C-alpha cells in the first residue's frame, strides 16, 4: 500500500483543526444544514428503493447495479461505516414493500390488557376468572359452579345483611368466602376444603343469614312465634368442640343482634335449663356439638323437622373424635335432602331441598361417605395448599434421639431447651402469645409449675379434666393477653380462634401427623407469618415420613437429622 502524500496529511490536519474549534451558527445556517441532511437521506432512501426494484425485476443479473456504481465512491463509503459479516444483498429487512399504506401510529405496541380488578363484572372473560382464581388459590370441582365474589357489593347478598357486614368492618372477602358464598346462596351443597383461620365462619354464616331473611315473613312473625313452634330449629351449625361452638356463636350473635335473630348454643358443660330458656326467643340459629344436640333432640328440647339449612364445620375433626355415628343420627332427625320439594314447606322456606354445607381441612374416606350419602351433587371448593402453611410458619425442630419423654416427670434436656427458646422469643417479640402442646395432662401441670418457678412469662393450663367454665375462662384470659402462655393438650388444638399467636411449641409431637398440622395452624393464620418449635425423639418415628413429605412442599431446606433418620429411609409414606 502506497503511503499518503505529506501535502494531503497537512491539508487533512488543517481541516480537522477547524472542526475541533466550536463555531457559532446562526438559526438560518442551522436550518440550511438540517434541510441538506434531510435531502441527502431522502436521496439515499430513493436510490435504495430503486436498487431493490431492479434486483427483483432482473434476478438473473444480481451484479448489474453494483457494476454501474463508482468503485471509488463505494470504497470511501465502506471506510466510513461498520462492515457486517454479511453482504447488503442478504439484508432481508430492506426488501419490504407493503401492498398498501398503513396509517402511522404514535405507539408501536398494543395496549396492555386490562386487569380484572379494573373491569366491570359483566366484562369479565373466562381468562379473567381463571386469573382471579389463581390469585386467590381457589380450585373448584363440580358442574355449574358460580364464579367467586370479587367484592361484597357484587355478591347478591340482601341489602340489610350487606349493611351489617360493612358496619362490622369486614372490608374484603377471604378466598373461602369468595368461593363458598355465591355457591351456597344458590342453594347448592358445598364441600369447602380450607385450613382453620381462613374465614370459614363467615363463609357459612352469611348464606345461613340470607336463607333466614328469605323465609316467608308471615311464618317468621306469626307462626314461628307460637309456643309450639319456638323450639323448631331453622338453621343448624355443628362443631366438634365446645370451644369452636362458642366461637361460632359469638360471631353469629354479632349479626343476629342487628338482624333480629336468636342464636342458641347447645354444648356440654351447660345445663339443659339454659337450652330451654334460650329457645324461648326462637331457635333461629342453633350452634351445637353432636353429642349434646342428640340428647336435646331426644328429650324434645329442640325440633329439627323444619331445619333445611345444615352446616358441619371441621367435619374431619368430628370424624376423628368418633362422631361419625352421631352425625348420621343427627342427619336422620333432619328433613331428607328432597322432602322440602313437596308441600307447603317449599313455599314457606323458599327451597327445593335441604342445603348442606361441609367444611373440612382434609378429605378422608369417612368424609367422602357422608358426602355421598347426605349431600346432593356438591361443589368442591379447595383453598390454597399445604405449601402455604409450610412457608407461612418458620418451623424449627430439636431432635433428641433416643431421649424419649415420659408422663411421670419432665425431661430435663427437653425442658431446658424449651425454656431457653421461650425466653428469647418473649424478649424479641412484642406482645407474644405462646401455645405449648403436650400429650399428657400431668405434663401440662408440671410445665406450668416449672415455667412459674423459672419466671418465664405468665401461663395458664387447659385440658380435658378442666371444667367447661375453667376452660372458657382460660381461653378468654389468653385471648385478652392477661397471660401470654397457654399450656394445652389437643383439646385446644382445633377450633378456638385466637388471633396473633406468635409461637407454637410441641413439647411432645402428636401421635398422628394431621394433629401436627392442626397444632401449628394456631400460628401463621390469615396470611400472617408465625413460628413453631417441635421436640422430636425416636418415639415419633411413625410420623417422620409424613413430616418429611409435608416439609418438602415448602421452599426451605429439610433438617439433616430428618433426611438421615432410619424411619425416613425405610418406611413408605402412609396415605
From Swiss-Prot:
Residues 421-566 form the Helicase C-terminal domain. It catalyses: ATP + H2O = ADP + phosphate + H(+). A motif (Q motif) lies at residues 150-178. GO terms for cellular component: cytoplasm; nucleus. InterPro entries: DEAD/DEAH_box_helicase_dom, Helicase_ATP-bd, Helicase_C-like, P-loop_NTPase, RNA_helicase_DEAD_Q_motif. Gene3D superfamilies: P-loop containing nucleotide triphosphate hydrolases. A motif (DEAD box) lies at residues 313-316. Residues 10-19, 31-49 have a biased composition (Basic and acidic residues). It is found in: Cytoplasm; Nucleus. ATP binds at residues 194-201. It is an enzyme of class 3 (hydrolase). It comes from the Eukaryota. ATP-dependent RNA helicase involved in mRNA splicing. May destabilize the U1/5'-splice site duplex to permit an effective competition for the 5'-splice site by the U6 snRNA, resulting in the switch between U1 and U6 at the 5'-splice site. May also act to unwind the U4/U6 base-pairing interaction in the U4/U6/U5 snRNP, facilitating the first covalent step of splicing. Component of the U5 snRNP complex. This is Pre-mRNA-splicing ATP-dependent RNA helicase PRP28. It comes from Meyerozyma guilliermondii (strain ATCC 6260 / CBS 566 / DSM 6381 / JCM 1539 / NBRC 10279 / NRRL Y-324) (Yeast).
